[in-house]
Amino acid sequence: GVLADRVIDSKCCDLPFEEASGLQLDWKALPVGLDPSMGCLYPDRSSRKREQVVGMVAAVLSAIPNTTESRPPTVVDFGAGSGHLGLLVGYMRPDVKVVLVERRSGTCGLARDRVQTLGWEDRVEVICGCIQEYDGPCDVGIGLHACGALTDMIIDFCTTRNCSFVVCPCCYGQIAGAEGAGVGQLPHV
């Protein structure tokens, strides 16, 4: 089907994401706030977070179309949190417009602070709201640890708009009271 034709074939391997993707970053050389391990108390977790973000960024970079004269490509990070993924994409591709969509107001505030600290207000927009509320341009929709039905929503949003997507679902750990719920009882798009 249409969706199957658009899914990038990938193979599992035992390499860390950074090594498997070929994208190597000097974390110390990045602007303050782009390292997802900053503020993390657990070294193992911060290392895994870096690997996950780099693996996703490599996939996103390969999906972004070339810049045209009419407008820059737009990457929309759904469930963006404080912007770890979207902001790193913006750093790697400064010609791209990045939109961070996050429903939690406190986390939106953190994302806005990070955008302001980086001085990227002109090319990164933070929208505090749900995916259904976003009606702007989108060339690539992305989501890392897209909780609950958000993975389905991102795929639906992108296939409806005929844009690319790179999504990594989560373990459904944040669906309150979902223990023993059947598929028909979970939120669905």
Language-model features: locations:
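Class I S-adenosyl-L-methionine
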Residues: 1-189
